[in-house]
């Protein structure tokens, strides 16, 4: 699914996914039992990417916690470095002009530049799914907001229970 309609930036599957996440926050904020001033987003991998894009697109999001976000530095392989999941251009045959241009619109790095809320961020150096070069790039472009970074060098595409507990405690403090 991650390559569905990738030849057209206006029809690419992530257009509706990103928009759907932003609209979901509006829906939640409208519920009687939800305090619209206490909405945060969190996730890992694709969920980390969606947390970042959602926080960038919807000002109702008050904080963001992300683990090893996917969909970051997607064209990295074209420039001799690792790219993030889904590794679109790892083998080169997918690298058409249209697909490359489409990724510029959906790369999480571009959304991270728009973050204006506190951030909890964690990843490891051994992740082969969302390589550390791509996840570091995302973190480095997040503007000067309150940021909490926890690098756990030995981890791969997973987290320790202590990371999850720290994230949960941080979210509770923020919200």
Kindly label every feature range from the protein language model:
Residues 1-19, 76-84:
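Cap/lid segment of the alpha/beta-hydrolase catalytic domain
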Residues 33-45:
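Alpha/beta-hydrolase fold nucleophile elbow
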Residues 42, 67-68, 152-153:
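Alpha/beta-hydrolase-fold catalytic nucleophile elbow
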Residues 50-96, 159-162:
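Hydrolase active-site cap/lid region
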Residues 96-111:
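Active-site nucleophile elbow and catalytic-triad environment of alpha/beta-hydrolase enzymes
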Residues 115, 121-123:
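Short beta-strand/loop motif that positions the catalytic acidic residue
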Residues 125-130, 157-158:
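Acidic catalytic loop of the alpha/beta-hydrolase fold
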Residues 136-175:
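C-terminal catalytic histidine-bearing segment of alpha/beta-hydrolase fold enzymes
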């Amino acid at each position: 699914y991650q390559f569905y309609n990738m030849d057209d930036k206006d029809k690419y599957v992530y257009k509706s996914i990103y928009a759907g996440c932003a609209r979901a926050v509006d829906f939640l904020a409208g519920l009687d039992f939800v305090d619209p001033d206490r909405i945060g987003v969190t996730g890992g991998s694709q969920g980390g990417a969606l947390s970042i894009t959602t926080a960038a697109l919807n000002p109702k999001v008050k904080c963001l916690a992300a683990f090893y976000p996917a969909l970051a530095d997607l064209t990295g392989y074209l420039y001799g470095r690792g790219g993030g999941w889904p590794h679109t251009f790892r083998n080169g045959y997918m690298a058409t002009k249209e697909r490359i241009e489409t990724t510029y619109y959906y790369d999480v790095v571009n959304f991270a530049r728009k973050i204006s809320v506190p951030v909890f961020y964690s990843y490891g150096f051994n992740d082969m799914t969302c390589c550390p070069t791509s996840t570091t790039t995302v973190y480095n472009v997040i503007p000067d907001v309150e940021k909490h970074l926890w690098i756990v060098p030995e981890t791969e595409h997973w987290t320790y229970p202590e990371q999850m507990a720290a994230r949960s405690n941080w979210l509770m403090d923020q919200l």
